[in-house]
């Protein structure tokens, strides 16, 4: 009995949990974050980031492997953010599984993954990877909605942004919001109060931070982390998601004069594949910056039908290189292609098209 006890104890002593920093667009190999060790990440050959706005020591990371999070300290001058909430120079916050760390200026998205390693004498190491973004270990963080997307709270006005006003001095609000979305879309899609429509295959919720008067997300119940995980086996599901999106438009916005688009972000920032159903008025206080606009009005936004055709022909979804650069393009009206210098001027310009 004592020998068995000692053997089990020996095995437990070599069981350890490790953390990895993973670039969402897979531009480079993942970076190991040893438990309680400080790791500096920024512009370097390792990250393949050449952007001069990103410092060589942009962030300081320290993994709390036993607690399941990473402490992130912004060291560089330009803003680092988590789920589009800016950390602030020399400020430190926690990065949870399911959240997306944007290294600088809401570019270069990273997520964290935890693995359990067990090393037994005379045996190879056994690893159990925990995917980020959900309580389901098969899922992985995957929309640069500039804020994380979930359903609206009960009683919310779908035409109003539910983001609270910015209070630079109130750091506690920022930190609270970082933790609140740690489970991504999974919680919202399973909350009956947030559901607009559901059937055996999909559920529809209103985007927590709508970028237009009408902005819904269609999500499959099946655990599909992102478009990269989609295969021909999912073709019927993709078609059903598209059909449900069109049904929601007819049921809830049938009298709207605005046209709609259905599509996916090329590099989403939240776990669980989701189809955007969005009206083209872009009349929302949540539409705040160039990244928001370009994520829906450049090739960064993949049309639903185009994705279906791609999967039908190639068996998978291919996203070309350089997608993050599209988010930095000049602001251009999606109706007449006129260039506008700022978001306020773009919004004022868009009003001219509403009456047409």
UniProtKB/Swiss-Prot annotation:
One of its GO terms (biological process) is single strand break repair. A motif (Histidine triad motif) lies at residues 272-276. Its main location: nucleus. It catalyses: a 5'-end adenosine-5'-diphospho-5'-2'-deoxyribonucleoside-DNA + H2O = a 5'-end 5'-phospho-2'-deoxyribonucleoside-DNA + AMP + 2 H(+); a 5'-end adenosine-5'-diphospho-5'-ribonucleoside-2'-deoxyribonucleotide-DNA + H2O = a 5'-end 5'-phospho-ribonucleoside-2'-deoxyribonucleotide-DNA + AMP + 2 H(+); a 3'-end 2'-deoxyribonucleotide-3'-diphospho-5'-guanosine-DNA + H2O = a 3'-end 2'-deoxyribonucleotide 3'-phosphate-DNA + GMP + 2 H(+). Its EC number is 3.6.1.71, 3.6.1.72. DNA-binding protein involved in single-strand DNA break repair, double-strand DNA break repair and base excision repair. Resolves abortive DNA ligation intermediates formed either at base excision sites, or when DNA ligases attempt to repair non-ligatable breaks induced by reactive oxygen species. Catalyzes the release of adenylate groups covalently linked to 5'-phosphate termini, resulting in the production of 5'-phosphate termini that can be efficiently rejoined. This is Aprataxin. It comes from Bos taurus. The lineage of its organism: Eukaryota, Metazoa, Chordata, Craniata, Vertebrata. The gene is APTX.
């Amino acid at each position: 009995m004592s020998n068995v006890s000692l053997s089990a104890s020996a095995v437990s002593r070599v069981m350890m949990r490790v953390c990895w920093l993973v670039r969402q667009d897979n531009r480079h190999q993942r970076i190991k974050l040893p438990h309680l060790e400080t790791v500096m990440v920024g512009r370097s050959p390792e990250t393949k980031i050449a952007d001069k706005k990103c410092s060589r020591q942009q962030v300081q990371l320290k993994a709390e492997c036993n607690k399941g999070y990473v402490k992130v300290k912004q060291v560089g001058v330009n803003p680092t953010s988590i789920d589009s909430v800016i950390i602030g120079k020399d400020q430190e916050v926690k990065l949870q599984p399911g959240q997306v760390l944007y290294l600088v200026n809401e570019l270069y998205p990273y997520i964290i993954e935890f693995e359990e390693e067990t090393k037994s004498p005379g045996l190879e190491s056994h690893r159990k990877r925990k995917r980020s973004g959900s309580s389901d270990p098969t899922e992985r963080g995957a929309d640069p909605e500039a804020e994380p997307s979930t359903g609206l709270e009960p009683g919310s006005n779908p035409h109003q942004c539910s983001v609270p006003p910015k209070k630079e001095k109130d750091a506690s609000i920022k930190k609270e919001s970082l933790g609140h979305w740690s489970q991504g879309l999974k919680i919202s899609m399973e909350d009956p109060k947030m559901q607009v429509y559901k059937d055996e295959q999909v559920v529809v919720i209103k985007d927590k931070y709508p970028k237009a008067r009408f902005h819904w997300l269609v999500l499959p119940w099946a655990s599909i982390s992102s478009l990269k995980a989609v295969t021909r086996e999912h073709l019927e599901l993709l078609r059903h998601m598209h059909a449900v999106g069109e049904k929601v438009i007819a049921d809830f916005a049938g009298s709207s004069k605005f046209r709609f688009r259905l599509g996916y972000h090329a590099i989403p920032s939240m776990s669980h594949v989701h189809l955007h159903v969005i009206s083209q008025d872009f009349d929302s206080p949540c539409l705040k910056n160039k990244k928001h606009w370009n994520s829906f009005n450049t090739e960064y936004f993949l049309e639903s039908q185009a994705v279906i055709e791609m999967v039908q022909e190639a068996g998978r979804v291919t996203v070309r290189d350089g997608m993050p650069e599209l988010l930095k393009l000049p602001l251009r009206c999606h109706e007449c292609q006129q260039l506008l210098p700022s978001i306020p001027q773009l919004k004022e310009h868009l009003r001219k098209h509403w009456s047409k």
